[in-house]
């Protein structure tokens, strides 16, 4: 099980959509066999705010659809094992999603808002677990896992 902290101060999403985010993350955690109790936060924001975060943290001066900030990565001094020793959940990190991007991309790809939302949630979650798409092999592995999770949840490309 994964504890999900949702931050939707702009009240962009309905209660059903927020529940979908929690359900999809718990499903994804099962699909990747995440055995340790973990925690993740998901923030829903504007295009302007995600643009600022992208510029500040990645040096890319444009908005994006989703950003992930893993607490346990190679560049961090953070030691996640102390949580386990104390019986606390493993803090995976933060996912930030641009709601205007969800709306636009759902329309562009011809599927539902919920399918696009779930896609970006799973994409961000996999980044927190160390998946990436910096080269062709990594991209294939990550995107295959992403689609498997969405398909098994019932939000595959043909089902949305």
UniProtKB/Swiss-Prot annotation:
Cofactor detail note: Binds 1 zinc ion.
PROSITE patterns registered for this protein in UniProt: UPF0054
Cofactor: Zn(2+)
SUPFAM superfamilies noted in UniProt: Metalloproteases ('zincins'), catalytic domain (SSF55486)
GO biological process: rRNA processing
GO terms for MF: metalloendopeptidase activity; RNA endonuclease activity; zinc ion binding
Residue ranges the record marks as coiled coil: none
Keyword tags: Cytoplasm, Endonuclease, Hydrolase, Metal-binding, Nuclease, Ribosome biogenesis, rRNA processing, Zinc
Domain of life (superkingdom): Bacteria
Residues binding Zn(2+), per UniProt: 123, 127, 133
Keyword check for Zinc: yes
InterPro entries from the UniProt entry: MetalPrtase_cat_dom_sf_prd, YbeY, YbeY_CS
Enzyme Commission no: 3.1.-.-
Gene Ontology cellular-component annotations: cytoplasm
Keyword hit for rRNA processing: yes
Subcellular location: Cytoplasm
Database matches in PANTHER family: ENDORIBONUCLEASE YBEY, CHLOROPLASTIC
Known role: Single strand-specific metallo-endoribonuclease involved in late-stage 70S ribosome quality control and in maturation of the 3' terminus of the 16S rRNA.
Family according to the record: Belongs to the endoribonuclease YbeY family.
Name this protein carries in UniProt: Endoribonuclease YbeY
Originating species: Shouchella clausii (strain KSM-K16) (Alkalihalobacillus clausii)
Gene name linked to the record: ybeY
């Amino acid at each position: 099980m994964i504890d999900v902290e949702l931050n939707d101060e702009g009240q962009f999403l309905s209660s059903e959509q927020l529940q979908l985010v929690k359900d999809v993350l718990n499903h994804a955690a099962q699909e990747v066999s995440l055995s340790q109790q973990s925690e993740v936060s998901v923030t829903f924001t504007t295009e302007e705010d995600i643009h600022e975060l992208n510029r500040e943290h990645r040096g890319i001066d444009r908005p994006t659809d989703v950003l992930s900030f893993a607490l346990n990565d190679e560049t961090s001094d953070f030691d996640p094992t102390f949580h386990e020793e104390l019986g606390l959940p493993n803090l995976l990190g933060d996912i930030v999603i641009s709601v205007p991007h969800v709306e636009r991309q759902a329309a562009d790809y011809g599927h539902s808002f919920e399918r696009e939302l779930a896609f970006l949630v799973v994409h961000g979650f996999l980044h927190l677990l160390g998946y990436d798409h910096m080269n062709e092999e990594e991209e294939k592995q990550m995107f295959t896992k992403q689609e498997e999770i969405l398909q098994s949840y019932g939000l595959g490309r043909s089902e949305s």
